[in-house]
UniProtKB/Swiss-Prot annotation:
Main location class: mitochondrion
Solcar repeats: 22-112, 119-203, 213-297
Record's protein name: Mitochondrial glycine transporter
Keyword Repeat attached: yes
Membrane topology note: Multi-pass membrane protein
Transmembrane segments: 28-53, 87-113, 125-150, 178-201, 217-243, 272-290
Organism, scientific name: Xenopus laevis (African clawed frog)
Disulfides per UniProt: none
A Pfam family: Mito_carr
GO biological process, alphabetically ordered: erythrocyte differentiation; glycine import into mitochondrion
């Protein structure tokens, strides 16, 4: 039907308008909508991860390590159930356009350089890392605000107020604090994830299962890829969080890493690893599954 809507099987966008969209814009829309779903569902895990890592910055926290379940209970008790979604506004402002920008950049690069063949493993790493770098740099100010919102240490009243306060007190540098650590975390994660995800999908027996269960199989491939990528990039995530919570205390990534090692040892680089691995793995797996289903509905190869 000419006015039917084609997004993940539901009626959201008129099909005649969809067909007129540029493929890159279609990839952006699909990515943004998949990012919306995954961000809303898994925001509580990101909040818990940030609280665990913020706990490291407290002098009184020496020798004590909060458990994920205890933190969840504490947040619900002190801030009610909606407290688990604290920071969801900057998360949306970061993830919705950020995920869309990532997928549209990835689509552009992939179809420009690899239109006639699939990328090799190392090429997949470079594709994922390059696309994520573009998105991460553009969205970093919102990442800083999100991290501070979730930490519970800052009394910002709005995202705009937070951006204004950071710029006023710390300058442009404050809005891009943790840039190096963010790229060290996000670019490798996306590159490693894309490599393992595409390899896992090739090994998966797609021809032996009902097409109806294809999204489940893709989601399972995403889980495996996400776990491997999360473990590899966890230290960079801890460093990034420390830099974004410490105002002007740290300006050099190496200094932060050295301080974590001196005060926490090697285990300090893996604080918040479980909730982060859960969130990043589930978010990436869901985002890719939804994105690929939506792109298929639009008649495009992801």
């Amino acid at each position: 039907m000419s006015n039917a809507l084609v997004v993940a099987g539901d009626s959201l966008v008129p099909s005649n308008r969809v067909s007129q969209m540029h493929p890159v814009f279609k990839a952006f829309v699909c990515g943004s909508l998949s990012g919306t779903c995954s961000t809303l569902l898994f925001q509580p895990l990101d909040l818990v991860k940030t609280r665990i890592q913020a706990h490291q910055l407290s002098a009184s926290a020496a020798g004590s390590r909060p458990r994920m379940l205890n933190l969840l209970i504490k947040v619900v008790r002190n801030e009610n159930i909606l407290g688990l979604w604290k920071g969801v506004s900057p998360s949306f402002l970061r993830c919705i356009p950020g995920v869309g920008l990532y997928f549209s950049t990835l689509y552009t690069l992939k179809h420009h350089f690899f239109s006639e063949r699939d990328p090799k493993p190392l090429e997949s790493v470079m594709l994922g890392a390059g696309s994520r770098t573009v998105a991460a740099v553009c969205m970093l100010p919102f990442t800083v605000v999100k991290t501070r919102y979730e930490s519970g240490k800052y009394g910002y009243n709005s995202v705009y107020g937070a951006l204004k306060a950071i710029y006023k007190t710390e300058g442009p540098r404050g809005l891009f604090s943790g840039l190096t650590a963010t790229l060290m975390r996000d670019a490798p994660f996306s590159g490693i994830y894309l490599m393992f995800y595409t390899r896992a999908k090739k090994l998966a027996p797609h021809d032996q299962i009902d097409p109806l269960f294809s999204p489940v199989l893709n989601f399972s491939c995403g889980i495996v890829a996400g776990i491997l990528a999360s473990v590899a990039t966890q230290p960079a995530d801890v460093i990034k969080t420390h830099m974004q919570l410490a105002n002007e205390k740290y300006h050099w990534t190496g200094k932060v890493a050295l301080n974590i090692y001196r005060t926490q040892g090697l285990t300090g680089f893996f604080q918040g690893g479980v909730p982060r691995a859960l969130r990043r793995t589930l978010m990436a797996a869901m985002a890719w599954t939804v994105y690929e289903q939506m792109m298929e509905k639009m008649g495009l190869k992801s």
